[in-house]
Design a protein with these regions (language model features):
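Conserved N-terminal structural module of periplasmic/extracytoplasmic solute-binding proteins
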Residues: 2-103, 252, 300-303, 323-324, ...
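Long, aromatic- and glycine/proline-rich binding clefts that accommodate carbohydrate-like moieties
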Residues: 28, 121, 125, 291-296, ...
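Periplasmic-binding protein-like
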Residues: 43-44, 187, 331-351
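Hinge/lid segment of periplasmic solute-binding proteins
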Residues: 92-156, 176, 290-296, 358-362
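Short, solvent-exposed loop/beta-turn-alpha elements that line the ligand-binding surface or hinge
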Residues: 109-120, 195-199, 215-236, 283-288, ...
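Extracytoplasmic/periplasmic solute-binding protein
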Residues: 136-152, 157, 176-226, 232, ...
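A bilobed periplasmic-binding-protein/Venus flytrap-type ligand-binding module shared by bacterial periplasmic
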Residues: 160-164, 308-322
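Glycine-centered hinge/linker elements that transmit conformational signals in sensory
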Residues: 180-185, 222-253, 294, 298
Length: 429
């Protein structure tokens, strides 16, 4: 019988095991996966790792911790070359940091060749240096983009909206969302036109990202000049703040859980949310609005974009079982496996899986996710983005608490971010 271990929140055990000797010659190879805990990977680890084991005879071990705990352990493993893990599960934001520091193996050198069925926006996130856009200081402008990471589970922010409130057609504009909110919100009965993640740092930045880009703004211009205090960005934040009267009290402290639960309990008409919440909307044990929520790409102002946020994976540069790790990547990224993954309720990263009729019937949100992935925009591809995001997200949170003064808060964020970037070697202007 094939055996697989799940060691949740026990990363120390994995490190100790890696240092404790090699075992006997007859012992099967065991791939050690390191990941942060998230329901988005449950189908993979619960259903597809056992299938991989059965198909290949390679055992797997899934080591899991909270988001920040796993990030620190993975960084330590990469820096020390301890070899405690074969495969890292990463937020797509981590790819520039891990690849740039040499913590990931070059997948091209290991023989991985992506086929044309990959969604371009998904596979491109695994390249370093990035295929498009700015390159951070120290990265040769002539360096060829190289594949260091692959998509593992697709994720993107889409608009969840109440069909019983908006009607058969999705809101055509952001003004439509605000108009319906102003007409139909009833805070006394806990009926709100909008809900958002407003907590400082990454949560509020994720919420603001789509509006920033939809209104024609961007984080950076030429030579990493900070532009998130441009007139377009100020207009976007002013609109974001104009929704506050139609939101629950305390949204400046909301993270994803509070945002999603407000929608599932029937208290909000719309929100931009990650796709991991899709299945829950139709689960009677979790949702009071079963079959009342539909999904689409957020509406257009000047642009129409969605925020990418994929689960990515890569082979650790110090992995003891690189060949078997690549065997897993080749297996899981096969189109037939991705189709089965989509039919099981996973969010795939291959076009054929998104277009599979059985998968589309079982998961009615796949069409919206595919459209959103097609127009998706990632966070800026620099290992220093997390610091800039924290700066901007802190000032966005202050704007929510202040309920106004959009330009002042964005100017303050821009000044602080510019100072940081210049200290880190960016031209920033």
């Amino acid at each position: 019988m094939i055996r697989r271990q799940f060691l949740k929140n026990s990363l120390g055990a994995a490190t100790a095991a890696a240092l404790s000797g090699c075992g006997t010659k007859d012992q099967r190879v065991q791939l050690t996966f390191g990941s942060y805990a998230d329901p988005g990977v449950d189908i993979l680890k619960d259903e597809f790792l056992p299938e991989f084991e059965k198909a290949t005879g390679i055992a797997t071990e899934w080591v899991e911790a909270d988001f920040s705990g796993w990030l620190q352990k993975a960084l330590n493993d990469g820096e020390t070359k301890a070899g405690a893990f074969d495969i890292y599960v990463m937020d797509d934001l981590w790819v520039p940091r891990f690849a740039g520091a040499g913590y990931l193996a070059n997948l091209e050198e290991l023989g991985f060749r992506p086929d044309a069925d990959f969604l371009p926006t998904a596979i491109d996130l695994g390249c370093w240096p990035p295929k498009n856009g700015l390159r951070q200081p120290g990265v040769d402008a002539a360096a060829k983009p190289t594949l260091f990471s692959l998509p593992l589970v697709s994720d993107v922010q889409i608009l969840f909206y109440r069909r019983d409130i908006f009607g058969a057609s999705p809101p055509a504009s952001w003004d439509d969302i605000r108009r319906v909110a102003s007409q139909k919100s009833n805070p006394g009965k806990r009926q709100y036109g909008w809900v958002t993640r407003g907590a400082r740092g990454n949560p509020v930045m994720n919420s603001f990202f789509v509006l920033l880009h939809d209104f024609g703004g961007a984080e950076f211009g030429e030579n990493w000049k900070v532009t998130f205090n441009s007139p377009q960005a100020v207009e976007a934040l002013e609109f974001y703040l104009s929704l506050l009267p139609y939101e629950p009290e305390g949204v400046a402290e909301f993270d994803s859980d509070q945002e999603g639960e407000t929608l599932l309990q029937g208290s909000a008409f719309a929100a931009t949310i990650w796709t991991g919440w899709c299945r829950q909307t139709d689960d009677p044990s979790r949702s009071r609005v079963v079959n009342k929520i539909d999904f689409c790409v957020p509406p257009r102002k000047i642009n129409r974009v969605a925020k990418l946020g994929l689960f990515m994976t890569g082979v650790a540069a110090s992995a003891p079982h690189k060949a078997e790790a690549v065997e897993f990547l080749k297996w899981f990224t096969r189109s037939d496996v991705q189709i089965r993954f989509a039919r099981a309720g996973g969010i795939p990263f291959k076009m054929s899986a998104f277009r599979d009729q059985e998968a589309r019937t079982k998961s009615r949100w796949l069409d919206a996710i595919l459209e959103a992935m097609t127009v998706g925009v990632p966070s800026p591809r620099t290992s220093d983005w997390s610091k800039v995001e924290d700066i901007l997200g802190t000032h966005l949170n202050l704007a929510l608490l202040d309920k106004g003064n959009a330009k002042r808060h964005l100017d303050n964020a821009a000044a602080e971010a510019t100072a940081f970037l210049k200290s880190a070697g960016y031209h920033a202007g």
